């Protein structure tokens, strides 16, 4: 289970939590402009926009969980088990396997508007990367500073939805998630007024009672509501550091703590990492479950005209600053 969100101050920020019971060996990976991309449908991109994000590198190929490109377009794939249905290959150059969907979009598109045009002619297939890495059932959040969309592949085709909430979790399908926000329209960050029975002497006995009823469990539908509420009401300074800090606080509202979500006896889902893409600066910030310090990789400190990946292992040991 995962949660992704967008946030805008003077800059545009995009990121996600990756929640799972184990890691595949994730790395922060810069894909420079001349890293050759060959897609299973036959298309090839010898040159393209540079990418930066978190990925599992298999046989030299970065399988991105989330990333941004040098133009500020961002994308993340989240579990959509039981609802994702991919098409069969048609034998054309626009056949794109699920695992290569993110670089297919980010390598070519500078904006959500351009991505919409590309998606209209893309046939998203369930072709696996390998026998050891079958096709993951995903849906995607895709955003730039001006637009945010959700992309879902279902039995009746590829759907592109406007996403005014700026968040995404997992099941159910996005239209149902968005509709469910209607149930919480009375919630507020402000203290409530007594509209229950003005004749009764009802008083707020605690701060935060305006949001009484906000879901607090770890299910994907509850995390969607909680993330949407937190994002919509978050107040931040305008600077880069203030914005990045606030973004991590927003996603902190849906973090998974070891022991609270048991997937089988002795195995628990945790927030393996949380990311924040500063889309206009090309900086990928992240924290890990074991290291709460915000770390960063700046794509512009790498050679973006190179042909080889630049790979950075995430810092996973707690980094505590002693003041005496």
Predicted regions and their residues:
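C-terminus-biased signal that marks the final domain/tail of proteins
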Residues: 1-13, 127-129, 135-136, 144-145, ...
């Amino acid at each position: 289970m995962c949660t992704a969100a967008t946030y805008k101050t003077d800059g545009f920020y995009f990121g996600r939590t990756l929640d799972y019971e184990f890691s595949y060996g994730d790395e922060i990976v810069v894909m420079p402009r001349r890293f050759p991309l060959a897609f299973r449908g036959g298309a090839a991109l010898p040159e393209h926009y540079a990418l930066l994000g978190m990925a599992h590198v298999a046989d030299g190929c970065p399988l991105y969980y989330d990333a941004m490109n040098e133009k500020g377009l961002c994308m993340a794939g989240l579990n959509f088990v039981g609802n994702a249905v991919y098409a069969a290959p048609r034998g054309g150059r626009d056949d794109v396997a699920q695992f290569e969907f993110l670089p297919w979009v980010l390598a070519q598109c500078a904006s959500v508007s351009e991505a919409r045009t590309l998606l209209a002619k893309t046939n998203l297939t369930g072709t696996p990367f390998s026998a050891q890495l079958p096709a993951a059932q995903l849906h995607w959040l895709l955003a730039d500073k001006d637009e945010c969309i959700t992309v879902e592949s279902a039995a009746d085709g590829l759907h592109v939805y406007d996403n005014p909430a700026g968040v995404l979790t997992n099941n159910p399908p996005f239209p149902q998630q968005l509709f469910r926000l209607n149930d919480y329209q009375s919630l507020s960050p402000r203290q409530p007024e007594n509209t229950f029975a003005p004749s009764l002497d009802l008083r707020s006995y605690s701060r935060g009672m305006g949001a009484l009823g906000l879901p607090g469990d770890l299910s994907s539908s509850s995390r969607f509501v909680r993330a949407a509420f937190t994002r919509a009401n978050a107040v931040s300074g305008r600077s880069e550091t203030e914005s990045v800090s606030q973004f991590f606080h927003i996603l902190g509202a849906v973090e998974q703590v070891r022991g609270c979500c048991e997937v089988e006896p002795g195995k628990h889902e945790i927030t393996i990492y949380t990311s924040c893409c500063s889309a206009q600066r090309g900086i990928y910030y992240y924290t890990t479950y074991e290291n709460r310090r915000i770390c960063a990789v700046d794509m512009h400190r790498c050679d973006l005209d190179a042909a080889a990946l630049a790979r950075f292992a995430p810092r996973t040991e707690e980094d505590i600053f002693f003041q005496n």
